[in-house]
Swiss-Prot record, chains A, B, C, D:
PANTHER family: CHORISMATE SYNTHASE (PTHR21085:SF0). FMN binds at R115, S116, S117, G276, K291, P292, I293, P294, T295, R317. It is an enzyme of class 4 (lyase). Reduced FMN (FMNH(2)). GO terms for molecular function: chorismate synthase activity; FMN binding. GO terms for biological process: amino acid biosynthetic process; aromatic amino acid family biosynthetic process; chorismate biosynthetic process. Belongs to the chorismate synthase family. It comes from Thermotoga sp. (strain RQ2). NADP(+) binds at R39, R45. The keyword NADP applies. This is Chorismate synthase. This reaction introduces a second double bond into the aromatic ring system.
Length: 376, 376, 376, 376
């Protein structure tokens, strides 16, 4: 599977193309609508958001609601037209402005924001949401939520997946801990008042991923590598930890095996469901560090690149934090990565064939006869 | 540039192939020798290490010490022959054993360790060390060191690069803080006694990387994405944070601009030298979370996959920690990533041409005439 | 550079995404308009063509007519709406119908034509035409024309490029030999009457390509491999020969060197401008074998896949031949391949930098000082 | 699956790395030995050949004769040591000499031949031969032979595959037509006397390839595109035609369907077994144009790049023709392409799982229930 994302934040469309989707898959557009809505509607988002309805259109690869095996293209129209703006020459710390100017050398910083703003994550969100229709066929569920905002950390995170989802959905900041939610809302209010912006952390979990997904052949097909590759493409993401961040002592960290009704279980899941680049049947979970938005409400020190004189960053209306929407985007990203690795494992063709392949291949027993001709 | 790594830990060779290296580059084999030696010689490494001399041979792409533009192949012989071993059927928590058995279904866990052991990082180390001969031509320097081992954290890290390197090299665990080094050695001794293993953290810095390296075109050519992709392929790596982990408030985190002698400077470098996927001229720095080695000195709970009865993991002689060598490997990984992005920026051909291209393209001034035909 | 093409022939848009285009390039939309018109307007095209105006829109990566370095997306709307059609279960020989049904297993052959019809080549044509704005900056010109249709072969092909273009453009079938053009028109008329379809051959030339483009590092970066990879993705293409098809004797075939005013010249160009995967400074030229359209005007023998009874292929209004439009498509394909290889050579960033790099690197002299430190 | 090939013709080894091979596959080294022998031993090969024994070693990814899922590395030692040679500054027409000098700018043409000589095809031959152990599991057989040498064309080519193989193997030039073989041997003798070299044509057939292999999703996953990509990477290959070269009239060319015992058959196979980028169940067959060797026995006109004076190409002992060994190399290339596409279709893991997947998925019937929820 290959995902291509294009689009400028004030262009006509954001575009996602998914190649390698099996044929015969029924796409539930409601999921896409819901995830785009979630990405847009959370506490702390600014005015631009409400100008965009995040309608979307699937313009290829789907016929009567069913995939055809051809590339699937999703277009998300940008509602906010491109206002005539003055040339901007004062770069904002934390944004691509300066770095892109040095590389691309076009003398208007407005240009670079078109590609590098978080607007393109709407296309990633749509692509991930579309792939949930695929994951559902294999009983794989993906869920993302906020675990930290500014200095407020979530403490009580339900273990039960449905409760976790419900509590998250009840939170204006997608944090399943109601008490922390209140603290986070206060953080947002205070930051807004100060003109400050907030970073934080997000956790994403994939439940139901079978053991054996990923690879140790090509280094870049290791599931960890795929996670690193896509998550670090998300603008606000500056850090990714797979599984527990507390990894100081082997005895505390390594997930021992036990048997439960004759089946293998783990007591803990510090490793995040991946061992050696391949899933081990436990939840795949990822912690993501999300940086504060670079567009602050009070000016920061900068330099006017035109005059090479000190200058202050301009005041631009913006969100206070990208952490809650980042939880939606990261959920989508994990859906993309798991789908990609799952399809690499199962091959291509018709979804019913892939499901049959999947169904026929339960966990191996030691004496299954594999490698039968091998003589040591 | 493309890096391919192959080799089994008890096979004849570990193999690294680098495609896309410019012609005419003088390779300093001494660097490779030194880095392989560093990877092998640090406190806490077990006996296997001393059995390997990490000789290496460059068998293609270099003629008389100069690259030819053809793929460069490095072979690192494995000295430790493959001992006859019994079939192993008890998976070790934290290792690929169980996950790979489910995927590949060959009934001997010894098989999977061949590819998934950290032994292949010797090839990555060699490849990164070779690329230092490239980076040197552009005055780019890469340095990695240990910042945490078990519960001991480094506090005093010199800002001066040469002092940093010197202090790191004086430390048996590659930690530039002498006091922390002592603590870390104690941690290792204690862990060894207990049969425990240690995780920790590593920091890698690339100094001298020019602004403008990376891209915002293809998502996966963003420098962050490249870092995520390669670092997460390293067996022991479970987490990567680019720049500071303290990213909770915009005012504290965003690196403001200032002018110094008419040149743009930053007061801080929390962003780790990358904005929007492109370097901004500051040091690129990365924190890496390294998990404890899964082969503990005391048995862990497991299951015998042959009998499906509870079992204990076998005692295998092993290192206590992979953190110090991981600092060498991560240094190599950053050298690979920076080289790759630099070559994408500069194109291919002869190194002298690339250097001329590089030299001719200083930072743009606003009125440089780029985009001159554009009429707003 | 990476080209992604999506779109169903009756969907809303055909989509081309180009990643890795340098910033600051002025796009001449007139070229795109012209090439789309040419693809559509030639003798022998059927009715569907006139229903499509091949309007197009560049919806990303271009700001005020100038590229920004972000992915460039071109949308070409499909004018012909999707008529309600009966399920089709009789596969046409030569079309994807049967092969795709076996793979994707959706019981309506209409589905597969959506992706596999030649309609997607409109997106390739647009992408190639857009890249002509890039090639123009480097004085590279690409030209395609018909050399054979049915049994009629072109004999008199002008050597002068401008004359060649003019004569081609005067021909209703894009054949620069006026006499052959007449014969080809007769072939088309006769075939139409008989319900037959016509194959043929196309020649594409890239003039002005500097020596040194391509690579011998990665096998798949050899220019020949890139040509094979893209040309064979074009639906009607079944054969590709680089340079002369008459390659039986070394003495006749190999292009000897001579000096003209102190510069190296070749007497002949049988090798098609590529030696060892790298351009040699002569014209790059490619012969393409184009198969007859699988939708014939008289029924062919087939099988109804629903009943597994013998059946005849349905009558569907169609073109008689794809050879003239294929000459437009192949011209675009060569523009894509040359652009891709040129950008790999020159790197990325701003077009003016790339032009300076290009300008600074004339042909090497033997004593240029490259490899100066090498001591044999 | 990904194939990487490295190695210099006078370096220690030629290297092939295959990533993505399933685990549990028994490798028959005898096939590799046989194909390397065939590549080396045919009429018209020069002296260098006999100096090489083409021993080979599989140094990774295989354990006790069985693949492990890890990358498979094959090393083929180069027996001919690197003789001390004078600097060479006179480029040979048809070889990479001049083009590579312009690109890489190293002042010794001997350098470029290291990578660009046909010597690396020994690694491709070994890789393809190894993959025959995979194809055999799916009853797929690949066969290549010479159809033209100089002006002599094969006429009588047996349709029966075993007879075809036998006759080919009896021919000193791998041409299954005994009469043509004689003519070809005369061509070689005459060419040798004249110092001339010979081009020709090769045909490669894959029998037993199931319908449904390939894809119409990503353009570059079409089977035709994969064939073009790999075949045009082979040094001597200048042309590739899939199926019949006679493609002028639809009625003559398109392969009509018929029923035989209730199964779908074709009367002809002009399309070469691929429709729309996907196999249709017929033999996949490819014609390959092979150029004459650029090292002629009598000097050609050239230029001394050092002095920029006219010069003659040096006399170097060489083969008269690469066509017979090219038939071996192209057979290997088709084995690689078909394996790659087959594995993309079937996914990864253990070979026995892949065989079960394969076995469970016979040709679909129209009413198989795929796409069952679709409501037009």
């Amino acid at each position: 599977m290959r995902l291509t994302i294009a689009g400028d934040s004030h262009g006509k469309y954001m575009i996602a193309v998914l190649e390698g989707i099996p044929a015969g898959l029924k796409i539930d557009e409601e999921i896409i609508r819901r995830e785009l809505f979630r990405r847009r509607n959370c506490y702390g988002r600014g005015k631009r958001m409400s100008m965009e309805e995040d309608a979307f259109e699937i313009v290829s690869g789907v016929w009567g609601g069913i995939t055809t095996g051809a590339p699937v293209t999703i277009l998300v129209p940008n509602k906010a037209g491109n206002p005539v703006k003055d040339v901007r020459s004062v770069p904002r710390p934390g944004h691509i402005d300066y770095a892109a100017f040095v590389k691309y050398k076009l003398p208007d910083l407005n240009v670079y924001v078109e590609r590098s703003s978080a607007r393109w994550t709407v296309a990633l969100t749509a692509a991930g949401a579309l792939l949930k229709s695929l994951l559902r066929e294999f009983n794989i569920d993906v869920l993302g939520f906020v675990t930290r905002l500014g200095n407020v950390e979530a403490k009580n995170i339900p273990d039960n997946f449905e409760e976790l989802r419900r509590k998250r959905d009840e939170s204006a900041v997608f944090c399943p801990d109601p008490e922390a939610t209140e603290g986070m809302i206060s953080e947002i209010d205070r930051a807004k008042e100060e003109g400050n912006t907030l970073g934080g952390k997000v956790k994403v979990i994939a439940r139901g991923v079978p053991a054996g997904i990923g690879s140790y052949s090509d280094l870049f097909k290791k599931l960890d590598s795929k996670i690193g590759s896509l998550f670090f493409a998300i603008p606000a993401v500056k850090g990714v930890v797979i599984g527990s961040e507390e990894m100081w002592y082997g005895f505390d960290y390594l997930d021992e095996f036990e048997l439960e009704d004759g089946r293998i279980k783990r007591r803990t899941n510090n490793l995040g469901g991946i061992e050696g680049g391949i899933t081990n049947g436990e939840d795949v979970w990822v912690n993501v560090f999300v940086k504060p938005i670079p567009t602050t409400g009070k000016p920061l020190n900068s330099v006017d690149l035109r005059t090479m004189e000190p200058a202050k960053t301009p005041y631009v209306r913006s969100d206070v934090t990208a952490v809650p929407p980042a939880s939606v985007v990261c959920e989508a990203a994990l859906a993309v990565v798991i789908s990609d690795a799952l399809l690499e494992h199962l091959g291509d063709g018709n979804i019913d064939d892939l499901k049959r392949r999947f169904g026929n291949e339960n966990l191996p027993r030691w004496d299954d006869g594999f490698w039968k001709e091998y003589d040591r």
